[in-house]
């Protein structure tokens, strides 16, 4: 059966007598709904199952609606649907387009690595080798177990003689650590710490944090209330931080788009967003779909950010260069 260019014309009417502008209204409606979700995601209510936060965790993926709707729009030869698709396309590009460009560049004098090593990681020694390949000045770890700690110390203590462990989080450093201690994030046990890293270029306050986990439940929605309260507590600690140069390394169990992390994200900037290349998704490691692991700063300049190769964890390690 021959297929000619005439079959692609848009000026004719379909079998129901509809023109290119009078068909495809359902597709157009779906396109405009996608645009509205992207543009007004902060207005999506969070009261029922924290649905707004759940949606914001995977917000970049809403852009996939554009190619999905584009195919039937072309098959229907609907000018209305195609015109409507311009809205979510432009909004998505304005929101996330800058993440697709490589923003790295410039010199650096400080490197940080962040990793949730996973309590079920059976080969933490190999994981530490992966982290050290980035030649970091500090390494932050979360979900450390008592059984894992000896193997971690065996790998790291030689190159990183200064370290502090509080509960299930730890920080290893090439430079002396002072003023170390736990940070209360209101969960009843220790999953955050603070330390001053005395670098050759001055002191940097480093926070390591592991926000409470979130769950998606059929009967309860996105259960994130405990994490949200912890974000408020950590945000308060950051507000009271006396040092001008601040670095936060952690598994925040939320993305930069998540409104619940605003007490933190309004004070600090993302290294990936400022100096990375791409979205830098870090979880799950088998098919990274969201960046819930963060390196964020205030008073220091990120010059590069990237993800490291997969380890035995369900999270990818992340790294960043800084100019102090």
PLM segments and residue spans:
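N-terminal, active-site-proximal structural segment of metallo-dependent hydrolase catalytic domains
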Residues: 2-153
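Soluble catalytic domains of enzymes that build or remodel membrane lipids, polysaccharides, and related
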Residues: 108, 112, 121-132, 143-324
